[in-house]
Amino acid sequence: MVHFTAEEKAAITSLWGKMNVEEAGGEALGRLLVVYPWTQRFFDNFGNLSFPSAILGNPKVKAHGKKVLTSFGDAIKNMDNLKTTFAKLSELHCDKLHVDPENFRLLGNVLVIILATHFGKEFTPEVQAAWQKLVSAVAIALGHKYH
């Protein structure tokens, strides 16, 4: 289990309160699909994903990105119990979707990049460290069913 300090929790929740989940979620998933094109195989029902502008403008990518980032809201509300919070999603992604758990780590790292671009100077090294810790813990929780 990962322990978050009061300072880390404050850094995460403060930034999360300013987050546009719809915009950042679509951008994060879109960036994942562009930068790591092999992840596109999990989204073959999303239509045209053949080039970056098609991916970034795809309404299904944006909608699913919002859904993914909304689940990070659950992580923020349950930072002390991530394994239980993501148990069902871990099972779904492992047993039904067969997603490589490495993709969770990649998405987390992409989210950190999105946060840095959206929040600039406000995204200090301390804030980044807190968020990196969270996205890593979420990736581990999502990959739990694989072990």
From Swiss-Prot:
Globin domain location: 3-147
Keyword Ion transport in annotation: no
Any GO MF annotation of the entry: peroxidase activity
Residues that bear Phosphoserine: 14
GO biological process, one term: hydrogen peroxide catabolic process
CDD domains in the cross-refs: Hb-beta-like
Domain of life: Eukaryota
Keywords: Heme, Iron, Metal-binding, Oxygen transport, Phosphoprotein, Transport
InterPro entries per record: Globin (IPR000971), Globin-like_sf (IPR009050), Globin/Proto (IPR012292), Hemoglobin_b (IPR002337), Hemoglobin_oxygen_transport (IPR050056)
Annotated Gene Ontology cellular component terms: blood microparticle; haptoglobin-hemoglobin complex; hemoglobin complex
Tissue and organ distribution: Red blood cells.
Binding, heme b: 64, 93
Function: The epsilon chain is a beta-type chain of early mammalian embryonic hemoglobin.
Subunit architecture: Heterotetramer of two alpha chains and two epsilon chains in early embryonic hemoglobin Gower-2; two zeta chains and two epsilon chains in early embryonic hemoglobin Gower-1.
Homology family: Belongs to the globin family.
Protein name: Hemoglobin subunit epsilon
Species name: Saguinus midas
Organism lineage string: Eukaryota, Metazoa, Chordata, Craniata, Vertebrata
